[in-house]
Amino acid sequence: MTSLAERAAQLSPNARAALARELVRAGTTFPTDICEPVAVVGIGCRFPGNVTGPESFWQLLADGVDTIEQVPPDRWDADAFYDPDPSASGRMTTKWGGFVSDVDAFDADFFGITPREAVAMDPQHRMLLEVAWEALEHAGIPPDSLSGTRTGVMMGLSSWDYTIVNIERRADIDAYLSTGTPHCAAVGRIAYLLGLRGPAVAVDTACSSSLVAIHLACQSLRLRETDVALAGGVQLTLSPFTAIALSKWSALSPTGRCNSFDANADGFVRGEGCGVVVLKRLADAVRDQDRVLAVVRGSATNSDGRSNGMTAPNALAQRDVITSALKLADVTPDSVNYVETHGTGTVLGDPIEFESLAATYGLGKGQGESPCALGSVKTNIGHLEAAAGVAGFIKAVLAVQRGHIPRNLHFTRWNPAIDASATRLFVPTESAPWPAAAGPRRAAVSSFGLSGTNAHVVVEQAPDTAVAAAGGMPYVSALNVSGKTAARVASAAAVLADWMSGPGAAAPLADVAHTLNRHRARHAKFATVIARDRAEAIAGLRALAAGQPRVGVVDCDQHAGGPGRVFVYSGQGSQWASMGQQLLANEPAFAKAVAELDPIFVDQVGFSLQQTLIDGDEVVGIDRIQPVLVGMQLALTELWRSYGVIPDAVIGHSMGEVSAAVVAGALTPEQGLRVITTRSRLMARLSGQGAMALLELDADAAEALIAGYPQVTLAVHASPRQTVIAGPPEQVDTVIAAVATQNRLARRVEVDVASHHPIIDPILPELRSALADLTPQPPSIPIISTTYESAQPVADADYWSANLRNPVRFHQAVTAAGVDHNTFIEISPHPVLTHALTDTLDPDGSHTVMSTMNRELDQTLYFHAQLAAVGVAASEHTTGRLVDLPPTPWHHQRFWVTDRSAMSELAATHPLLGAHIEMPRNGDHVWQTDVGTEVCPWLADHKVFGQPIMPAAGFAEIALAAASEALGTAADAVAPNIVINQFEVEQMLPLDGHTPLTTQLIRGGDSQIRVEIYSRTRGGEFCRHATAKVEQSPRECAHAHPEAQGPATGTTVSPADFYALLRQTGQHHGPAFAALSRIVRLADGSAETEISIPDEAPRHPGYRLHPVVLDAALQSVGAAIPDGEIAGSAEASYLPVSFETIRVYRDIGRHVRCRAHLTNLDGGTGKMGRIVLINDAGHIAAEVDGIYLRRVERRAVPLPLEQKIFDAEWTESPIAAVPAPEPAAETTRGSWLVLADATVDAPGKAQAKSMADDFVQQWRSPMRRVHTADIHDESAVLAAFAETAGDPEHPPVGVVVFVGGASSRLDDELAAARDTVWSITTVVRAVVGTWHGRSPRLWLVTGGGLSVADDEPGTPAAASLKGLVRVLAFEHPDMRTTLVDLDITQDPLTALSAELRNAGSGSRHDDVIAWRGERRFVERLSRATIDVSKGHPVVRQGASYVVTGGLGGLGLVVARWLVDRGAGRVVLGGRSDPTDEQCNVLAELQTRAEIVVVRGDVASPGVAEKLIETARQSGGQLRGVVHAAAVIEDSLVFSMSRDNLERVWAPKATGALRMHEATADCELDWWLGFSSAASLLGSPGQAAYACASAWLDALVGWRRASGLPAAVINWGPWSEVGVAQALVGSVLDTISVAEGIEALDSLLAADRIRTGVARLRADRALVAFPEIRSISYFTQVVEELDSAGDLGDWGGPDALADLDPGEARRAVTERMCARIAAVMGYTDQSTVEPAVPLDKPLTELGLDSLMAVRIRNGARADFGVEPPVALILQGASLHDLTADLMRQLGLNDPDPALNNADTIRDRARQRAAARHGAAMRRRPKPEVQGG
């Protein structure tokens, strides 16, 4: 009698499953469940060879890839642990293995694991977590759907390597170690994190662990313990100790290969990896429509028992386990055509395993029998030990699924102990199709454990199952991309876009959407991409990834949240031609609604709504517009309803209340159309009457404003900040003008008739009469009325009369609705209410405002994006095919208990290359690392002109190392077969604390290999620094060379002296790079040096040619240059920039000899060199040929952005204690001139005049005489100065100018600022031309005009004076011009008096001061900082931008930058037509974007508006404005004309105001002004430009304080473009275009308000402008400069008193010579003297007026006296200046040749007197007050 099990085994799988379910329900145990087929539905894996999933694994198998490599240095030092002798203590017999990269990387945040716990977790556990998740995704089972289900986890683990690493560092052990390393925690954590309720079992049977785990999982499924199972295993090789132990058994292959079943078998090679499969009962998988990859028909396990040894295999036990599995699978051995064997390649194990295979699968060889192939994945990836079984299992599953048997590697002939001749078994050496067979394809998998546990599994081809095809392709697909954070959503979108455009290009879009929406986990954050086709989907995904707006893309922040939806129906104004056409074609619900409404519409309105929409013509006339809009709104409502979006309340705006009433059920559609038809026809009679305007005023302010206009009424309460008025057109326009003066929005609203106003009154009786019989019903949906405050409006005739006449209470209705509702959807053809809705609801941040259509965008995509935002998809894609989308992209971070390199002194990764990735295509390689000085501090010892720079030797080493690593040379070995050719440094790389570096090795189509080295700018752009070509040549040793014969003799040079000489040229070699220990110059022009790597330089085995050695060798080339030539310039230095070839023949130790040759190139363009390195054995170790040294100027050395950015910040600085009264009076004794504007036509002017009058009364005293004059009356000002100039009893002490306060109009501010600047320059000219001796101090006084706190807007007029203060500090430092901004709300004159009394104390003076209450603030120049993490949008893809001054040098640079960043349209403003050269640039830009040139002066009315209008014409949104217009006319204040001021002022200041006004209604990301460093730092000769720039700076601050986007950059001079060049060559070096672009990207992204960008020359500032020491504004810069040094020690004029006249004259001459050299840009004094005769006029050397001012200022700083500028400009020589200074110092000059100075000085005085006399003849008598 047959058993129950035997009879059950004869049933079909489905019958057995059905019987099992019945018995389970009956509570009966069913022993034959062990026969039920199990489906493999998902795979996840990571194996050597960059295998990251089943697809890449199969590709590796199909290609026959051998992934074995030398042990990576980050595991252990392979050489240090290697010994071929197995008995060697602590050594292993192999250097090889199969390794997975980045095993220290883990996405802890994704799984909610803290960094501390992640560090303690065994990397095997981490990898299992990620791979298990990937396996579930591959299966199409959302991991989050398994929570609470009977899902089991069975995993094989046996390695404890990480525990060993932990134990080695006992101090780092914490509580997490107890859950981080035990094997049970690996499975327990998966079950815990996914909420799984099935069994979680960790299996350790050594090498069979993972296949035993799969067997147990199948059993658990068959026994109904689980419904889904995750099974597999993991193995990582982190420690050398297991390999050492295995070597003692001679188990490891010395050759590092598994030669399975081959005669060359000599042991196995270890591998590592992880594999997880997802299993379900076949019947359940078919029921659930899962994709079945293969079927497990049967499995079995057993043990070897007592055999030849515990670790020795047992052929009989192996045969038995195979037989059991076949029996339980109910299949015959001959039906199996492939066996994935254990096949380790051991001498003992292979013959024993073959014996068992021959006894089972090998039988039956003969006619008609199909052969059976034997394979072992270990030949590809090594023996994965605990993960070996799952690796073989996955290989078998893929093979039966794809019907192909991959070839077995490393097999040539059978092991002599194996006789396969009588069997059907063979080893495939080539990949082949599966043998044809009558039944399904079958394979088997064996895995045998070290402990004796054996496992065998029979795998079968999956049955054909019908997968429900996707329904007809929807007109749109919704792709839901989910992630735990918005950043993860973005990265998932990027990965998916790349896949869809690459490997997944053939996958139908509907299937992609189906897989995303139905088979992926839904996380906390998700976004949706709506698309019609693949291209649109890819573009949407890329936009989502980049954070850029695009129609059809709903990002993570756009989804509606919270309960309660309100449909809001707009009034008139949303109509447009062609509205609804796309919806008619694409949306059946919309088309049906229109069709059903049309008969009623025709009956009530008189024409067809349906035909109107189909025709797409513009609807004209109020009597047609309003009914059509109501019809559209009703149809759109039905469209929303068709997707299940139902309103909880409705609101209507004006006529929109009709639609709201119909939707709420208060009116039928017939009644609603009747109401709107009657209403609109009556309104048509009044067409053209009245006007309406939108005002940026709240209701109270609007009511107050229109109180004076009785015919103007408040028509609409739009939002808390906006209202609409109605009334006669002329009165409405007057109100608009009044509001505009407040710098608030005010504009007409386009209407046919002004409703909600008495104009409507004549038609109201007829409206009530026509609707008198209307019978409204109680609404089924609440209506929130905008006509009455009533909560229950009745939609009768009276209501509709009031609806037309009463003000629209929209703001109140929305506010009321917002209490209980969170989502507001505007129902209209185009959004017209969203701004009012947002303005009303936004303050609490919990509401979502949406619209239905947008006339600028695709109607269907837009609507479905809105649907997605409320959580409804166009198509749920419930049916479709599961496709293999890319798995979740992990955001890996490194977690390790200690630095892995601590296991060996020899670090794993090359320090200048970093992490290595081999690209899957073309064999390219990429490395990434950080070479910043915090990571590589030794690199900070290589400086060029004070800046740490990556040495060319460093780039060369990177090229060598990259080529060696990529081409197979060991990490610590030289590469004599690798030659670096055509090495070139294209751009220097400045180093800061962290400097990321990317190196790429590229294989070209022409078989050439290139290495390219990049950094990345702050804007994300890659910047290439160095390139080289790589050549593989036959291995060769260096040829014999005469240099190798021994040290040469010649002239010895001290290394210390040589390095000191190099420092003079800007090259600084710190301790790590000062490697020359001996230098000998030879007679033939070459040099020989000895190089010893300093202790400060790092040791690392990966260096092929240590950068310190090569750099020292290159220094040796410099050592061949004569000293005089090296030291010839402090402004340029010879640097290596290219090499023809680099060859390294052998290892170079820490000591080497170098022979360097040098050749000068014709024309002085550079020098060529060659070096040979000879090791201690006398062998040539390396050669570098064709070294090109180029002369590099200081300004060409790049600086990090942080070293170029400045700001002016306010610092609280209490005033010093005021001395006793009488001494204080002494400091202010003398004549004072008080100037103010006598006209008081504005409140600000009156305030200033009043304050001036009060000051005069308070300030006058017996010791102080006070004169007054009108600041704008030039004659009066000059007369006042003339009056005081001749008063010896009251010498001039100070001039106080009171400047008018704020105006309500910026236009008035602009004019006042310009006039004030001009008037103050008049004061300056009067002071300079009238007063001799010590100049009176100039005080500029304003009231509340400067912005101190962020919320203070300030006034540009006052702030523009800061530019003048900065310039006068350099042109007339003795005037000590000071701007004081008083707090007019306190006691301003007390503060001012304190300032004036305190002016004489201290060595430095504050030049910009602000009082706020009793707190005193001063402005200080400081280094700026940026926060790039803010990530504000810079340039949006496809958006429009405007650039004023767009045809200038800077303008075109900005245009190119915008186009490079993806701008769609760039509008350039210019005053003239583009030149031919500019046209060429524009033509190139036109190929990538739309470039439009608008001609006109931006300062002229209408031009700015035209620029904005042009930008908007493209349809793209205007997102940014760059105001770069400028005119530069350098002129000293003394000689400035009003026309000069006007020409400079107009484009910069007036143009800025015009652009500000023109963009008032634009939603900009940024508004950027290009200002000048002159307003921040000062620049003699640029007063007009500095003041205009300061006005622009203040306008930007005013915009920010008003809540508008704005930023300004105070640019220093650019090297190739731009106009402001005054300080070039002295204090400021030029900015390169690349540096400027980097600043643009970074500063806009960081959202800074004001930033100066300039290359300030610290070493020359004090020399050129010694007066900055006396100005506290420059305190921080002076402190920096003091450390940089100046002209050397100078004892001052007192030191001259101790010298005899001849020595004093020489000292004065030498000091002035140094000053002149510095000012005129000569780097060596000898250019002036003695090479130039002492009596040669300086004007013949190229001196100009700006230089003359700086020479005078320098003389004052050095000697306390000054030569007149006129003296310098009128032919004075160095001798003449010396004579004048000697005379003023009271020193007798014995040199009669110096008397020429008298003549020149007399001539200068005569001219000054003539000018003074002419002025006197024009002056009226000034008013005099005081004692």
Swiss-Prot record:
Q: What is its EC number?
A: 2.3.1.292
Q: Which residues carry this modification: O-(pantetheine 4'-phosphoryl)serine?
A: 1745
What residue spans carry the region label Dehydratase?
Answer: 910-1076
Q: Where is the signal peptide?
A: none
Q: Which PROSITE patterns match?
A: CARRIER (PS50075), KS3_1 (PS00606), KS3_2 (PS52004), PHOSPHOPANTETHEINE (PS00012), PKS_MFAS_DH (PS52019)
Q: In which pathway does it act?
A: Lipid metabolism; fatty acid biosynthesis
Q: Which residues form the active site?
A: 207, 342, 383, 654, 942, 1111
**Molecular-function annotations in GO:** 3-oxoacyl-[acyl-carrier-protein] synthase activity; fatty acid synthase activity; oxidoreductase activity; phosphopantetheine binding
The record's Gene3D superfamilies line, in alphabetical order, gives: 3.40.47.10, ACP-like (1.10.1200.10), Malonyl-CoA ACP transacylase, ACP-binding (3.30.70.250), Malonyl-Coenzyme A Acyl Carrier Protein, domain 2 (3.40.366.10), NAD(P)-binding Rossmann-like Domain (3.40.50.720), Polyketide synthase dehydratase (3.10.129.110)
Q: Where is the PKS/mFAS DH domain?
A: 910-1198
Residue ranges annotated as compositionally biased, kind Basic residues, are 1807-1820
Cofactor-binding details, from the entry? Binds 1 phosphopantetheine covalently.
Q: Which residues form the Ketosynthase family 3 (KS3) domain?
A: 35-461
Looking at the record, the residues that make up the Carrier domain are 1706-1785
- List the GO cellular component terms: plasma membrane; polyketide synthase complex
Cofactor(s) annotated in UniProt: NADP(+); pantetheine 4'-phosphate
Task: Answer yes or no on keyword NADP.
Answer: yes
What name goes with this protein? Phenolphthiocerol/phthiocerol polyketide synthase subunit C
This protein's species is Mycobacterium tuberculosis (strain CDC 1551 / Oshkosh)
Question: What is this protein's gene name?
Answer: ppsD
